[in-house]
Amino acid sequence: MAAQGFLLIASFLLILLVLAKPLGSGLARLIAAVPLPGVAGVERILWRTLGITDHEMNWRQYLLALLTLNLLGLGILFCLLFWQEWLPLNPQRLPGLSWDLALNTAVSFVTNTNWQAYSGESTLSYFSQMAGLTVQNFLSAATGIAVVFALIRAFTRQNVHTLGNAWQDLVRITLWILFPVALIIALFFIQQGVPQNLSAYQPITTLEGAKQLLPMGPVASQEAIKMLGTNGGGFFNANSSHPFENPTALTNLAQMLAIFLIPAALCFAFGEAAGDRRQGRALLWAMSFIFVVCVAVVMWAEVQGNPHLLAAGADSSVNMEGKETRFGVLASSLFAVVTTAASCGAVNAMHDSFTALGGMVPMWLMQIGEVVFGGVGSGLYGMLLFVLLAVFIAGLMIGRTPEYLGKKIDVREMKMTALAILVTPMLVLLGSALAMMTDAGRSAMLNPGPHGFSEVLYAVSSAANNNGSAFAGLSANSPFWNCLLAFCMFVGRFGVIIPVMAIAGSLVSKKVQPASQGTLATHGALFIGLLIGTVLLVGALTFIPALALGPVAEHFSLP
């Protein structure tokens, strides 16, 4: 089993790196605002048609453009969901959503979280899925990538005040990166058996003679961008464990690769844009180390078997509860770590049925800020925040003003870094405390004791860090939970983006200082270790008390 797990991890990472490197070169061209080959003429026509100028924006203008797009999308999506019954492509005649569920869902998809307090096949029409959710899957992913583009330019430019044109970046990211790659993935899914139609649900008779209604819909197109954009919201309630979303072992592998593809490619793009590929590789090494350790822990925990079944004398050599037999324990464990290391949230197994330690690792990966590869764009700018913190700590130890890529890190940058890093932990801890203190929060818990608390902690961690996965033993479709999690999702997304853009605005105007003998090398093994230690230290200090009350207590209470 250990050899199989090692081979699975190694194969996955090898294929990922082979695919990510050329995509990273394309992303680096977009960061430098250089059109991809053959599209310059098309872009000129687009700019004239859409009224987009070549005028570059400072950080406030860039941020305002992104906020305007997202708030407009939030309002439109809310209206689509609320008045769904009056809109076309609704063959099942599904009613509109309640105001609180429509708000929660709109915020969820605009913030790239894709938390779902509903069952897709029994709640949403095809029009809502296509014109509402799928559109936001593209736009929310493009927003995250645009933010990291601006931050990378802040490190590579000097003595200027502009970070690029947000509208041009959004169009280029969507048309030249997200759409073509998603199209290729969607066609592969269709070939593997994922439905792509607008047919009404199909009544069938099973082999046992029972009547059943099979849901249909444009699944493949949404599934592709759901994974590529690290969105994670499933067309069906069972998400990627549903055979219509993830029918084969090949689609399972493709989905995991799609989740990590752009986050890994952005590391390569960062190195190319910075003029030193070692900088991008250092971040990739740090992310990969944490990722591999986490996968190993989850695989080990899940192959130990279910303690309750073992105590009852049952044959439980591995913990198969909540897992699909077509994937097995190892692939399900790998998928769980991939989807929570990135801010995807798609699942091919029930995380609530993992062992206590097996479920704790995905929860902790979310709590440290989704920086182990992370979401498209958000993972890299989240890790760069930890880079600035690590550089600052190193500067304190050696008595030098901290620098990164030749840019001095001053008080303003560190204040914004601290604010951005602390936003999500505050939301998680305060939100969980509020839920446990109120009757409305506790009434949603379907399990008592440490596991019930773990379900609450997981839900708020998932929302605040824009992941979207869940321990499903929580009845979250209530006004209290819909509003609480919508608030956590919105602040967790834009409460980090705003200080990140402020950091970019401050750094871009600074001069690049030449390296000296005392300059800390940020591409070697020493700095990689310091960066990993910084991530682990912040995660440990912040969440160990909460984790001790949940999964750790549950683990020690097992038979």
UniProtKB/Swiss-Prot annotation:
Keywords: Cell inner membrane, Cell membrane, Ion transport, Membrane, Potassium, Potassium transport, Transmembrane, Transmembrane helix, Transport. It is found in: Cell inner membrane. GO terms for cellular component: plasma membrane. The chain crosses the membrane at residues 5-25, 27-47, 63-83, 132-152, 170-190, 253-273, 283-303, 327-347, 356-376, 379-399, 416-436, 484-504, 524-544. The system is composed of three essential subunits: KdpA, KdpB and KdpC. Part of the high-affinity ATP-driven potassium transport (or Kdp) system, which catalyzes the hydrolysis of ATP coupled with the electrogenic transport of potassium into the cytoplasm. This subunit binds the periplasmic potassium ions and delivers the ions to the membrane domain of KdpB through an intramembrane tunnel. This is Potassium-transporting ATPase potassium-binding subunit. It comes from Salmonella paratyphi B (strain ATCC BAA-1250 / SPB7).
